[in-house]
Structures are given as C-alpha cells and as structure tokens.
Amino acid sequence: MNAARAALREALRTSDRSILTFGTAWVYERNGAVVANCHRCPAAEFRRRRLSVGEIADAVSTLLEGPLAGKGVLLTVSPVRHLGDGLAGNAASKATLRVAIEELLARHPRQTEYFPAFEILTDDLRDYRFYADDLVHPARQAIDYIWEQFAGSVLTDEARRLLPEVEAVVAAAHRPRDPRSAAHRTFCLRQLERIAALPQIDFQSEAAYFRRCIEINS
C-alpha cells in the first residue's frame, strides 16, 4: 500500500496530464470519516451514504488546486455498473457524479475536460451485446470502440501513429514464463532497441524492467 502511494505521488509530480475516473458516489463512513469498508469489519460499524454534488466538487477542487495544480485533467465517469447499489442506487450515483463533473468543468474551465465514456456505452452503443456476460462490465468490442473514440479525440496524428509501437513495448513489460532463458534475454535486448528508437516517449520504467531481466540472464 505504501509503495503504491509513493508511486502515485511520483507519477503526479512528474506528469503534466492526468485522468480522473469517477466510479461511484456511495461511500462508507466511520466516526465521521470516509473509509474503505474492506477490512472484514461488521457492516453495522459503518454508515453508508451517497456524497452530494457539492462534496464531490469541493474534494476534487482541492486536488486540482493542490497536487494537480497546473496540470491538465481529463474527467470521466466509469460505465461499469455498481449493481450492489441496486439499479436505482447506481443510476442516482452516476447522475450525481456526472453533475459534479459539470460543476468542476465550470469551476476549472482551463484545467479540466470531459470524455464521455459513460455516455458512449449507455447512449451511443446502448445494447446488451456490448456488455460482458455479467451485464456489468463492457465487452471487449465496447472497450475497443471507446478506446478508438478516446484516441481520436485526445491524441495528435503523431501520437496515433506511434501508438502501436508504444502499446507493443508496454505490453511486453510483463512477467515472462521463463525470465532466465536466453530467448527472453534476446527479447529484452530487442525491446531496449525499440525503446531507443522512440526517445520522445517516457519508457523509464519499461527500460528498467528489461535491463533487470538482462542482468538476471547475465
């Protein structure tokens, strides 16, 4: 947990753009503070309520004026349904989040933008065949469609041209089945060559990963 927080702080410090995706307006409180109800404590110890538009807008504004000050922020609402809240509860939650984003766009017009991932799935596609078997998460076809819309709206022509190369490098930086094999060492060397050919892209973490793999095989 602490390592994840440290990584987040470093990412916020070094990035000039961020994406904030809102999932649900429902929270759990204990002793007046919002907490994560994931500690196997009895539900009776927590108070569950839906945040107001103002509370959400104020909390995110604090981030925009603090750690995210001077950075461009893209706001989205997750199209994933929180059916644990019930159909009506999920609808009220998503509506609250959407109105809160409108408030944030009005408060911080130069810093924030909105990408309609939620509307694309629920209004543009609006068909159960675009959902996975659980009828909660978007299906692969829907994910690909939303990604195409996203890339077309926020990426430059040059970024879209480089995207396949970037995706290939990022996808390759995963735990291999046989990290000590000669074949994997050769693969890592090729990936470092690929990274060297794209100096305009920040591949620091991926390059460090491939170098570690090469050291293991040395």
Feature-to-residue mapping (PLM):
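Acidic, His- and aromatic-enriched active-site or binding-groove loops in soluble protein domains
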Residues: 40-48, 93-105, 137-140
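Well-ordered, non-membrane alpha-helical segments in soluble/globular domains
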Residues: 50-64, 91-100
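Extracellular serine-dependent O-acyl
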Residues: 72-74, 95-127, 149, 159-165
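Short amphipathic alpha-helices and their capping/turn segments at secondary-structure boundaries
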Residues: 2-19, 60-68
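A solvent-exposed, charged loop/short amphipathic helix patch at secondary-structure junctions
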Residues: 30-53
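Structural motif
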Residues: 18-21, 74
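Conserved catalytic region of serine esterases and O-acyltransferases that act on ester linkages
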Residues: 133-134, 149-218
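Active-site segments of SGNH/GDSL-like serine hydrolases
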Residues: 25, 65-91, 118-120, 124, ...
